[in-house]
Amino acid sequence: MKINNNYRLILAFAVHLMFSGCNSTDPGTPKPRTYPRIEFPERNYQLFNGCNFEFEYPDYAVIEKEKTYFDSVAPNDCWYNLFFKSFNGTLYLTYYPFSNNNEFEKLINDTYDLVSKHDVKASGRTEIPVKLKTAGGMLFKIEGNVASQTQFFLTDSTHNFIRGSLYFNNKVNIDSMQVIQEFIDSDIEHLIYSFKWTK
């Protein structure tokens, strides 16, 4: 009889341990990855007027003239970089004058070639035609873990052509960067739709 009572006691203790070890806050379960909270700046726009064009850009960004192109001098004085310092991103704006249809077609083809280089890692691409009073062009939205998700070109189709491409100076991670990408994309769209050729 004593063995039976000891057996019951051990069995009750084992059952108690099994159930007390199961709780809803299991420390062995990995928690989902989170990213730091991002403080977005207030949006106000200011006018840039230089070379043959003008546009509005956010006042939290800094615009500077591009002085070099790889290891040489920039091809002309109308190349600019729009720095989004708080997000470690840069919108590269490259302006090209042209004088004939062959040069114009080459600029368009070069733009499509540069956009297509992202196709290797892209999961998709949307091309949005842009029609303005003094300009027309195309806005490219490239999906996936690519180096540049937003690119565009604008032209008057007779003498002036500008190309823009947004790059971040960090490792591409679409999950952590998407909210920043969307925030800056709205400012790039504002830049595009406020754009005017002045000459």
Question: Can you annotate each of these PLM segments?
Answer:
Residues M18-G21:
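C-terminal motif of bacterial Sec signal peptides marking the signal peptidase cleavage site
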Residues D59-D71, V115-P129:
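Short secondary-structure junctions
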Residues N23-D26:
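Bacterial signal peptide processing site
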Residues Y45, N49, F53, S99, ...:
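Extracytoplasmic/periplasmic, Sec-exported soluble proteins
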